[in-house]
Amino acid sequence: MEKTQKMNKMGTEKISRLLLTMGVPMIISMVVQAVYNIVDSYFVSCMKDPNIPALGDYAVNALTLAFPVQMLMVAVGVGTGVGINSILSRSLGEGNKEKCSKISGNSIFLALCTCVVFVLFGIFGVDAYIASQTSDPIITSMAVSYLKICTYSSLGVSMYMIFEKLLQATGYTMQTTVAQIVGAVVNMILDPIMIFGWCGCPKLGIDGAAIATVIGQFISFFIDAYFYFRCNSKHFNTSLKYMKPEGRIIRQIYQVGIPAIIMQALMSILTYSINVIFVRVSTDAVTAYGIYYKIQQFVFFAAFGMNNAMIPIIAFNYGKQDKKRVNDSIKYGLIYTVSILCAGIIILQLFAKQILGIFSLTESTTELAMLAIRIITPGFIFVGANIAYQGIFQALGNGVHSLILSLVRLIVVPLPLAYIFSCFDFASSIIWIAFPIGEAVAFIVALVFMANIRRKKINPIKNSV
């Protein structure tokens, strides 16, 4: 009975409550993920050396340059996970346990392949990548060292994200939250110890930040793996014999997964391109953008958490052909996600100065980061809707629509505008406007896509089962 109730809650529980019970743990999980990205920045901003003025700013700059590759690692894991989540949830709704086992086993195989790719990039590509963004020897040295440690140890991040999605698809969101929190706490504890050489540990500087991050990721991986074999085995066979690659399953995963990977990777492309564009303005602008971006992630990742809860619920009920529950999931998913972003607008507008005061930055960098927050955050209301629509499209198998939406909001509109604005003498004051304009245009595109998908996929569904 317990097993049946667990399997059916996505098809029976009231949607408004179900989204919260599944979404809140995922929101916590995603916010904890944002902690990984900001804790390192905080501690390295406190690094000091009498021979290197503003060493903290140099270190934050180095992390900003390395960050797009870290985002790409996450993009591949999350994008693959979205494909897994979508087809696994639909297969659960259809009651196809054998297919669920194959999806899960092939997912683990794909995570191992991802790790190999990033290790090879760490060996052969990191130096050239960093050199394409800066010629400063101090920043280059720190960025290369940090990024090589992260790529060589990419097994942790690749595996924990796949196991996380496998658990989320079956409704075990609290377990993934536990794994995220424990990993983040370990990271936060180890960061100052390794960076500054506390408790008898050698003073490792920025390398210590990388090592602490990697250890935290491996801890999350081990916990998620434990819960996966313990919990998901109640619903389908979790034997590793299903790791044998099966082309049909992998194709189905990546029909949704590849657009999602590209969609997530666009954030890496955006950040890398913005770094290159902002160098034309000033080094302070690059550092300010890096700090703003990581602060912004606390709000965006909370919305992604709700999005992650919405995707399996919509997919499950679409698999069951339950029209009412699909529509309710879309409605409440939009309401909750936009509400999260509206709360983010209020918090960042009211407390920008206090939040930026956490970091040991120069006055000029702090002023630029403050300006970025003031200008960009009003556009968050469009961000909330766009994130929700991306999840809706993915859940219904329209990954290409999500990809196009991401292209518009992250590349097609903001990058050309940012480049144009960077050509003006007062570039540092106006370049930030490119981001909310991109979100507003993408919102219009999303409305058009949603109307088309509703007509073709949702409206033809017969009355609720």
PLM-predicted stretches and their roles:
Residues 81, 150-168, 176-184, 209-224, ...:
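Short runs within selected transmembrane alpha-helices of multi-pass transporters and secretion channels
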Residues 27-82, 86, 150-157, 217, ...:
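Transmembrane helix-bundle signature of multi-pass secondary active exporters and lipid flippases
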Residues 26, 30, 42, 86, ...:
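Transmembrane alpha-helix boundary and packing residues in multipass membrane permease domains
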Residues 35-38, 46-47, 57, 91-94, ...:
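Helix-loop interface residues and adjacent transmembrane-helix termini in multi-pass membrane transporters
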Residues 193, 387, 412-422:
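Transmembrane alpha-helical segments of integral membrane proteins
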Residues 60-120, 157-176, 288-346, 350-352, ...:
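Small-residue-rich hydrophobic transmembrane alpha-helices
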Residues 136, 172-173, 282, 362, ...:
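Short loop-to-helix capping motifs
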Residues 1-23, 88-155, 201-258, 314-379, ...:
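Short alpha-helical transmembrane segments in multi-pass integral membrane proteins
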